[in-house]
């Protein structure tokens, strides 16, 4: 699964709107929609924010793993 498909899947699992996630990332809703559609690449720092927020690993978000490993606590 591609990362853009994964971030949409996770957002929907959490019953969040694109606007809420866009606010979390400090971007506009249209920009976030472009991330989900694959039209625009999402910055790595935004992927880190999402991984922490959803408590999943970057491997899961990027599709390198299908296991929802928790983001390591520090």
Regions found by a protein language model. Give the residues of each.
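Short amphipathic helical patch at the helix-1/turn junction of helix-turn-helix
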Residues: 1, 12-13, 41, 52
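DNA major-groove recognition helix of helix-turn-helix
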Residues: 25, 36, 54, 65
């Amino acid at each position: 699964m591609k990362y853009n498909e994964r971030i949409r899947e996770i957002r929907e699992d959490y019953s969040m709107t694109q606007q809420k996630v866009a606010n979390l990332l400090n971007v506009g809703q249209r920009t976030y929609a472009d991330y989900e559609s694959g039209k625009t690449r999402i910055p790595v720092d935004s992927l880190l924010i999402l991984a922490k927020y959803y408590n999943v690993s970057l491997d899961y978000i990027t599709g390198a793993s299908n296991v929802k490993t928790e983001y390591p606590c520090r």
